Curated annotation (Swiss-Prot):
GO terms for cellular component: plastid membrane; proton-transporting ATP synthase complex. This is ATP synthase subunit a, plastid. The lineage of its organism: Eukaryota, Viridiplantae, Streptophyta, Embryophyta, Tracheophyta. It is a multi-pass membrane protein. It is found in: Plastid membrane.
Length: 247
């Protein structure tokens, strides 16, 4: 009987874990289109956090920065260093783009662990980090693709497209595909890491006391920051390569 009872309890625990759903969405009907409502909601929250923090930090700028102003100046200097290292001396115009990518991804990733999204109940699905949705990460990848196409064309004009037929026109399809697969690989890596991190925490919380998953959550925060840095760094590297023609 003890063995049977243990087996039943084990199966019940597995059944509870199987209730964790992935891919459930809350849709908004806009004309003939279905829009993922929860992604827009969480993205707006992240944008509001970034804009609100920046506004509060620099509303009274000081010659000798302190507090929030000092923190944001440090972040800006860090983003400038990353951009200059990857793009080169012409990095200046691209600092806002790289900085936006880094900060949006960083805050989005951390929001999945630190913000109590589940307090807000939706008719379908649930709120989670924006980067927990493949649509967000693919959109970021497409923005990166558009950025380095723009950078290359701005630098070289229509001569930028000559690289697609070098060293031989036979490689044209492969060269075109390569330009799109590189940023898309970034999007899948980012999506997979954030989704896996949140699923691991959910499963551990359902199996063990709430204290045990804390180390996993801390590790998740660390890896989330690293993922934001990797995405921003490689985006800057692709832009730099597009301008230099060393793809």
């Amino acid at each position: 009987m003890d063995v049977l009872s243990c087996s039943i309890n084990t199966l019940k625990g597995l059944y509870d874990i199987s209730g964790v759903e992935v891919g459930q969405h809350f849709y908004w009907q806009i004309g003939d289109f279905l829009v993922h409502g929860q992604v827009l909601i969480t993205s707006w929250v992240v944008i509001a956090i970034l804009l609100g923090s920046a506004t509060v930090a620099v509303r009274n700028p000081q010659t000798i920065p302190t507090g929030g102003q000092n923190f944001f100046e440090y972040v800006l200097e860090f983003i400038r260093d990353v951009s200059k290292t990857q793009i080169g001396e012409e990095y200046g115009p691209w600092v806002p783009f790289i900085g936006t990518m880094f900060l949006f991804i960083f805050v989005s990733n951390w929001s999945g662990a630190l913000l109590p999204w589940k307090i807000l109940q939706l008719p379908h699905g649930e709120l989670a980090a924006p980067t927990n949705d493949i649509n967000t990460t693919v959109a970021l990848a497409l923005l990166t693709s558009a950025a380095y196409f723009y950078a290359g064309i701005l630098k070289k004009g229509l001569g930028y497209f000559e690289k697609y037929i070098k060293p031989t026109p036979i490689l044209l399809p492969i060269n075109i595909l390569e330009d799109f697969t590189k940023p898309l690989s970034l999007s899948f890596r980012l999506f997979g890491n954030i989704l896996a991190d949140e699923l691991v925490v959910v499963v551990l919380v359902s199996l063990v006391p709430s204290v045990v998953p804390i180390p996993v959550m801390l590790l998740g925060l660390f890896t989330s920051g690293i993922q934001a840095l990797i995405f921003a760094t490689l985006a800057a590297a692709y832009i730099g390569e597009s301008m230099e023609g060393h793809l």
